[in-house]
């Protein structure tokens, strides 16, 4: 036997012993997990809202720098080590893939529920059961026809802007003031509307698609939109002033149109079509020359069929480009997977994957015109098709990071508008919805039957305590929107969220100065004589609020009967101070519409003024902040389900090998 054979004792090949696995197991409420969750929540909370702080992310070894407060870009850029954080991030990213918006809200509510349930000291399974009950109550409230849902008139510019402006204005990384936010929001609206097919056209109705091009080192005011699709044409100098001439079809049903051939294979002579082909060449022939000759035959065939544009996802050989231009045919290459879809949408061409010269006419696309478009000292080919309402949104900004953030929020805003076509409903934004839901939870859970908490194996006090925890988490997410030291108050008539300046304690006219609530649907003057004001979360900085006089009336702190829990409950309402303006007049209660919880007749979860209800007409001329109904409901579901999933986990087991 050979000395080097596997069976020899003298073999020089020795097996490396497998390193023994190290399995560690720790409870989910391990201090390391709690610290990681708090840090993660702090990062997200400080990024939330228009006054949030930007996060600068870079790999320790260098590389690309990301400056953002967007959840999607944030989660894509950071690396998480704790399994619990990976689970939360995966749930948020799954929500964003479908809905695009609401990532920070989902993550914050998830983290708040997990942390508060851990701190409650109650069994996690009990927390999960109560969370599911409260979740169902909230969803029933949201889905009521006469409840919180606000109908969106798709023909109203003000109503649609109420959905767009909060998305664009919520990201400070865009570096825009109020006027610029309004300007960009209007551009997004115009581009979206221009991309909707006409109902009188023969074209199949599809979701609007808007191309977005970013231009760096130019002011935001240079942003605009162009009908059609723009494709970069670096081969055409910007100083070229002549019209782009392309052959067209002069007769037949396609008369006056420019035909387009669209390829997703290389036209540089290295097509994958010939990889497995075996061939023999005569000494005087070369494979590259033969391939180029075949492609030129293909060009002659396309020109004979009236093709004026050849677009390729990959590379077109320079000699083939010259051959095309000599015959008046424009060439576009290196389109990438993204741009080839845009060309396909506007031309309605079939993507060709072969160099076969027998190209059927039905596989060719059509354009109305091709023009040169010089924009910011760069040349583009402007593809126009009057039968296909495609639109290009050109966004400008001074810096690369601000431009990337602006492009991202505009894509999210366009997706939000697309969702509004299918589900034209909205919800109060800017934290008002969370305050209303928190009030509904506190009022409704006290009216539930005793059998409910008996079935889940807890006392009434424990049930009310966990319901209060859920309501507090909703309020905490809402209060994370503003970070300038304002106090948060709510009125007992509509339960919307209002902001009180930090120096409002000494301001005797603070009630008149508030104007509208955070979302803009309610004003301080509506039924002013009936309002009671609750200070939510206490006064910041340790200050105490004394009596405040307004119009001669002395306003004292107290606690409303509606916000007081059952005496048997260990939960105190010390976090909420009440400023009573005037006792409510029961004779005027018929002016309000009661929002009732389904299945529990007579239980008021809030009140909506009938004169200023959630009607489409009431949205006109108001600077409102609204959230998409579909996005917010799904974000709420994902947050609660993810929190419950984490609470169900008993141990984390890590196998390190």
Residue ranges with predicted function:
Residues 2, 6, 18, 29-33, ...:
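N-terminal switch/interaction subdomains of large nucleotide-dependent motors and GTPases
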Residues 101, 110-155:
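Hydrophobic or amphipathic alpha-helical targeting/insertion segments
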Residues 31, 399-657:
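Extended, low-charge hydrophobic alpha-helical regions
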Residues 32-41, 81-97, 298, 408-425:
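Short, hydrophobic/aliphatic alpha-helical segments
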Residues 83-117:
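Elongated alpha-helical scaffolds
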Residues 2-7, 134-427, 541-542, 649-657:
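Long, structured protein-protein interaction/assembly regions in large complexes
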Residues 11-30, 40, 88-95:
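Transmembrane helical cores of multi-pass ion-transport proteins
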Residues 62-94, 277-292, 296, 300:
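Glycine-rich oxoanion-binding loops at beta->alpha junctions
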